[in-house]
């Protein structure tokens, strides 16, 4: 059911992306900037924005610019993240910097970042609410950068605690889903308690989503549209790895950059055998349950129920 709702709302998002984010001159820059947008994706963040607007009893079309702005920010972060991580694949296509070069990819990300705020400013809402929304999205972008820096700095350290990992994930992934869920409450001038509850729904959903994403990196071989096992090879301190290290597990391929499939499979088996994978799954589920509890402040409706189902979907998807 929820997958059909996601597809339906994503269709609206894609149509608006076509309208607002056209290719233009200089062609080389905009081809790079639109590369991931054209590659598709589930559009989960803008779908959450539209469903949140509906759950608040508002016309979702009045939140469409905010939804596109958030998807544009998301794509800007992907372009820059892929440069830093040196990933070659994303969404089943070559990464922007691989195709267009690093200088153009940096400019493409910067362009998307600026376009996001331009699009948000077009929202059909009172000017003072738009200003608040712009301010909140700007703060989210700062926190995303902080989270990305934390993630990179963890790679240089021998050990990272679970609480540090969760704070990094809250910033790198959680806050963008937090603003996705709460920005309609800002634009429509809803009560602060409603805005806060939707923010928390998004934050907790985002943490659960990221933990599940880390799980997919070692279990979603051939499905996730990026390099399988790349987190291990890059030396990323995911919750799974943190737990495995606590259990005294040694991973031969961790942070090595390259390894044979056989070596990688041996290390991944260790993560399953020591209980680290099951532990991460349990933690992801806990965060999703916390997310859903925050929706209780909103009157029951089909759209609220869709948000509940979507939270479950975030940790049940296979890609």
Swiss-Prot record:
Its cofactor is Mg(2+). InterPro entries: Isoprenoid_synthase_dom_sf, Polyprenyl_synt, Polyprenyl_synt_CS. Pathway: Isoprenoid biosynthesis; geranyl diphosphate biosynthesis; geranyl diphosphate from dimethylallyl diphosphate and isopentenyl diphosphate: step 1/1; Isoprenoid biosynthesis; farnesyl diphosphate biosynthesis; farnesyl diphosphate from geranyl diphosphate and isopentenyl diphosphate: step 1/1; Isoprenoid biosynthesis; geranylgeranyl diphosphate biosynthesis; geranylgeranyl diphosphate from farnesyl diphosphate and isopentenyl diphosphate: step 1/1. Mg(2+) 2 binds at residues 81, 85. One of its GO terms (molecular function) is dimethylallyltranstransferase activity. Dimethylallyl diphosphate binds at residues 90, 172-173, 210, 226, 236. Mg(2+) 1 binds at residues 81, 85. Pfam families: polyprenyl_synt. Its EC number is 2.5.1.-, 2.5.1.1, 2.5.1.29, 2.5.1.10. One of its GO terms (biological process) is geranylgeranyl diphosphate biosynthetic process. Signal peptide: none annotated. Binds 2 Mg(2+) ions per subunit. Isopentenyl diphosphate binds at residues 42, 45, 74, 91. The keyword Phosphoprotein does not apply. The keyword Metal-binding applies. It is an enzyme of class 2 (transferase). It comes from the Archaea. Keywords: Isoprene biosynthesis, Magnesium, Metal-binding, Transferase. Homodimer. Belongs to the FPP/GGPP synthase family. Catalyzes the addition of 3 molecules of isopentenyl diphosphate (IPP) onto dimethylallyl diphosphate (DMAPP) to form geranylgeranyl pyrophosphate (GGPP). Catalyzes the synthesis of geranylgeranyl pyrophosphate as a major product and of farnesyl pyrophosphate in smaller amounts. This is Geranylgeranyl pyrophosphate synthase. It comes from Geoglobus acetivorans.
């Amino acid at each position: 059911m929820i997958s059909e709702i996601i597809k339906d709302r994503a269709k609206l998002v894609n149509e608006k992306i076509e309208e607002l984010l056209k290719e233009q001159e200089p062609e080389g820059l905009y081809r790079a900037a639109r590369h991931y947008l054209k590659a598709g994706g589930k559009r989960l963040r803008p779908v959450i924005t539209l469903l949140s607007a509906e759950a608040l009893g508002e016309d979702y079309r009045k939140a469409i610019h905010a939804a596109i702005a958030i998807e544009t920010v998301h794509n800007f972060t992907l372009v820059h993240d892929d440069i830093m991580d040196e990933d070659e694949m994303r969404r089943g296509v070559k990464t922007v910097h691989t195709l267009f070069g690093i200088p153009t990819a940096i400019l493409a990300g910067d362009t998307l970042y600026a376009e996001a705020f331009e699009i948000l400013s077009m929202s059909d809402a009172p000017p003072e609410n738009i200003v608040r929304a712009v301010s909140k999205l700007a703060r989210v972008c700062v926190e995303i950068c902080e989270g990305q820096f934390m993630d990179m700095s963890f790679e240089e350290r021998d050990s990272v605690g679970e609480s540090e990992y969760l704070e990094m994930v809250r910033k790198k992934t959680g806050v963008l889903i937090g603003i996705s869920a709460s920005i309609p409450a800002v634009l429509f001038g809803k009560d602060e308690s409603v805005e806060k509850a939707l923010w928390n729904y998004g934050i907790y959903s985002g943490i659960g989503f990221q933990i599940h994403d880390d799980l997919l990196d070692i279990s979603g071989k051939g499905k996730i549209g990026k390099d399988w096992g790349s987190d291990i090879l890059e030396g990323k301190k995911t919750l799974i790895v943190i737990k495995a290290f606590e259990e005294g597990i040694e991973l031969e391929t961790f942070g090595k950059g390259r390894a044979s499939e056989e070596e990688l499979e041996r290390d991944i088996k260790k993560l399953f055998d020591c209980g680290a994978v099951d532990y991460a799954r349990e933690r992801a589920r806990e965060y999703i349950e916390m997310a859903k509890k925050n929706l209780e402040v909103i009157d029951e409706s089909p759209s609220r129920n869709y948000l509940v189902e979507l939270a479950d979907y975030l940790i049940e998807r296979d890609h």
